[in-house]
């Protein structure tokens, strides 16, 4: 309908170039799909060049937003001699990056991104770089960051179970973070009784059997974790 399209056009017009570029990460639909669907009218030459860039058309590179220019220059510069641009992590992972560049990404990563990419950092040698193990461990167990991230214990439990090759300091930090994250779970008032099902079916993975997409965490582990969180936050 015309009303939804008009709303999307207004959203595109009011979105800054920086944020719009960050929004271009992802598919189904992609930002390119959205632009093709609503046909927004550029308000200036810079936005016209930016839309052309996002649509894969010919554009004037000098009119592109600064972060887009930096990203394109980064891709054309030999690895090891360039500065990592301030763009979403997902835009960089498909590129051929040096250990130095991966280390820079890890050093500047937000809390959630750090938690979700421990194996990636390990695989690219980040933990072998001076000071990075302590930096990552300190970030992971930061009480302030854990509360701001509103992370739940099960997310940290999954990270712990999958980061089997991470340094001991990092894995210990995940355990500390898990304990702190219990504060992010709801508190139930009154007398609380917890009964955990330990029948044979509870040994199944949480995701079910999905081939390579099967989680390493099973149902009884999640049930036990939920029970522990309730006990931590309940007085009786």
Predicted regions and their residues:
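Long lumenal/extracellular ectodomains of secretory and single-pass membrane proteins
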Residues: 1-218, 232-236
């Amino acid at each position: 309908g015309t009303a939804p399209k008009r709303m999307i056009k207004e959203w595109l017009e009011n979105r800054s170039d920086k944020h719009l570029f960050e929004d271009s990460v992802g598919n189904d639909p992609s930002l390119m799909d959205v632009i093709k669907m609503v046909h927004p009218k550029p308000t200036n030459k810079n936005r016209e060049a930016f839309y052309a860039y996002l649509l894969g058309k010919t554009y004037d590179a000098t009119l592109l937003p600064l972060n887009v220019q930096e990203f394109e220059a980064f891709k054309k510069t030999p690895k090891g001699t360039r500065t990592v641009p301030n763009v979403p992590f997902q835009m960089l992972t498909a590129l051929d990056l040096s250990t130095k560049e991966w280390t820079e990404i890890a050093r500047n990563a937000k809390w959630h991104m750090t938690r979700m990419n421990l194996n990636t950092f390990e695989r690219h040698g980040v933990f072998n770089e001076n000071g990075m193990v302590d930096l990552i461990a300190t970030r992971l167990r930061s009480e302030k960051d854990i509360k701001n991230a509103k992370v739940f214990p099960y997310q940290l439990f999954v990270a712990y179970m999958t980061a089997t090759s991470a340094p001991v300091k990092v894995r210990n930090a995940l355990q500390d973070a898990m304990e702190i994250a219990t504060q992010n779970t709801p508190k139930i008032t009154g007398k609380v009784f917890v009964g955990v099902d330990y029948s044979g079916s509870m040994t199944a993975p949480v995701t079910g059997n999905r081939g390579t997409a099967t989680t390493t965490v099973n149902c009884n582990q999640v049930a036990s974790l939920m029970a522990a969180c309730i006990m931590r936050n309940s007085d009786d």
